[in-house]
Amino acid sequence: MARVSVLQLETHFPRIAGDVGCAKTFQCELEIIIVPNATVAKVVTKDPSQLDLRPFQDALSKATGDLITTSCGFLAPLQSVLKPQCKVKFIASALGQLKTLSTLFSPEELSIITFDADKLGAAHLPAGCAAFELSIFGLDVRSHLREVISNDLPTLDENMASDDVCSAFEKATTSKTKAVILECTNLPPYKPSIRRVKEIAIYDILTAIESNLPNSVNPQFL
């Protein structure tokens, strides 16, 4: 059976079905490798050049999957650094899909929904995609889901989190929006709720994994 390895931040908040860190999300085996000291506060930063790469390189060396990914979209810049060290397919972030999607959608037609819109910027986007920096929208700073993730809380109200994501989605889209990318790997569980607001093309870490390792993701989460 195929295996997906996830280099996961050192967090304890709930990872529900649809999250890249939950075994129920996949049809294949899931291997979780915790990256020591890689907290949300350290990784969610405006300046990814300040990231300490060594813990991620160590975690990568332990991975045994047919595909290796991470649990945070802010790690997008690691694609160019870690991929050459990887013998299998490596996906640092859902944002890696933007390079291809930028040939299909304009910044006006594609929105990026992130955990923290104040910190995600051009430095996290693929080369040639800086124009999409204006398409970035985030969770409300006072939202329940953001509080759970930021403070690494042990409990999550899924209904409140769903409302938070739908609220961010509504602010991120207009009548011209044709697609969205969910940067944050904790957002895919709420795709059914998003689609009840508006039927739209949704790209996230799971669609990236599935396109590179077919039949790995449980179809209900695509």
Q: Which functions belong to the PLM regions below?
A:
Residues K87-L95, E109-T114, E199-A208:
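Short hydrophobic/aromatic-enriched beta-strand-loop microsegments
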Residues S49-T64, D163-K176:
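Short, well-structured alpha-helical segments in soluble
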Residues M1-L51, T114-L156:
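N-terminal glycine-rich anion-binding loop in soluble enzyme alpha/beta folds
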Residues Q50-A59, F74-V81, Q85:
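N-terminal active-site wall of soluble small-molecule enzyme domains
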Residues A201-L222:
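Short, flexible loop segments at boundaries between secondary-structure elements
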